[in-house]
């Protein structure tokens, strides 16, 4: 009981620790993908987006399939879970789900280890993951990896519970939990396959195993069948996913694996698991040498090694966020690593205290500074975006047109409060003469415009012809009494002002400073990868932006200002200007 109370206290403290850094903001293209889909499900009951105008902004992961219907390339599972929170509490409530799942995952680690190894081992294992920097950062990154970890742990707990009490209802709920995982991330379909293999291994030794497997499959059908039906309706085949639109199925190869696996192994030690990683690997191996734990050894092997190899073979080179792909395996290595410690320590209390306290001290010395650094940066960028939102809520009427860069639009898009323009469709109108816009790094020119109608309408236009077409479309979209606002840097507003006709002008409404200290650079340089791997592609296939923003040039450059996707977070303010006309 004391250990359980201590675990609950740890979960509460961890959640409040995350809340200190939490800001209701979307700082990545992936987050825009999941949470705009959340809004669409909550307000319209669909994952489909139909732009009202060729100017309408669409996030980087939204692709047109047919008849001006756009769908996100990501799985909708996390969006379905967040939709009720959005309806009841707005954007902030929906964004709280991920940190909640991150903290609850610690309790699941405690429950798994305590049930499997004894009461004294659960709390140290949970504490170890509480200081893991990748887990803590992605608790506030608003992507899908934390949710996968939660359901992986819950599913593992139910499987081990089933082994102790092989009842059909436990198998059914386990199947439902494991079935949620591929609805959250398509590639993680290998996890429920591992769970099914684990159950199948018990057919010879457990009389009720076959019936439990059928119950497990019935449980899996609850979340997976709706996903397959959606895939059939949206993509024309139940086995197709949004990744096929972007050619992701061609993004894996042996050449990538041989080039990247040494870096991944290094990063797993330095950024991912640190000291528990070798213990975790050895623990999985040692499980095979005990006849009572062979099945668990195979389960944990299948939950860790295949997904690690898969992402090592992915075309995108290792970067500061690559460890997010392997985050679920860190929980597995922690569980098996503590099992290894238990074998080494046995029942000696002094050895238990010495080894566990040493491991926790080293892990804390490694993980806490990295966690504080990553979370502090997220807090800073999130504060910038929430401040921008507050300024817009104060000055820009709901439903008005807003022209802003992608770094702002991908966040503001979640609320649906304003109508956002795809600024890159007409970017030349906002580019100062003789130099590029400060908010448009070289990477931005490589991203195809998402709004297909806008790409066709404005793609070959320039100068006065482009401005006249833009003027006509934006005011048609705004309506007779609508208003149009710009939220851009001064030089961009000045460049646009030169294109205005007589009787038009820009009225300054407000300004906001978006300065942010440069974040510490972590290992790995961002080098543009060769994609598509299978050759050039047409249509809406696009080069995937890294999760934290544009690719920087290789090598250290400490003079660069920090960026929020394509927005330079320097000392120059963003100006909120109203486009006025007679």
Task: Report the location of each language-model feature.
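Signature aromatic-anchored transmembrane alpha helix within multi-pass, membrane-resident enzymes
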Residues: 1-12, 120-123, 176, 197, ...
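Short helix- or helix-capping micro-motifs
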Residues: 10-11, 98, 122-133, 157, ...
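Membrane-lumen/periplasm interface segments of multi-pass, membrane-embedded glycan/lipid transferases
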Residues: 55-66, 232-288, 312-313, 320-323
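Transmembrane-helix motifs of polytopic, lipid-linked glycan transferases
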Residues: 93-117, 154-158, 285
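Hydrophobic, aromatic-rich transmembrane alpha-helices
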Residues: 104, 200, 270-301, 305, ...
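Short acidic/glycine- and proline-prone juxtamembrane loop motifs at membrane-interface regions
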Residues: 134-147, 409
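Perimembrane helix-loop-helix junctions
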Residues: 158-167, 191-224, 228-229, 284-289
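Membrane-embedded, lumen/periplasm-facing catalytic core of multi-pass transferases
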Residues: 355, 359-410, 435, 442, ...
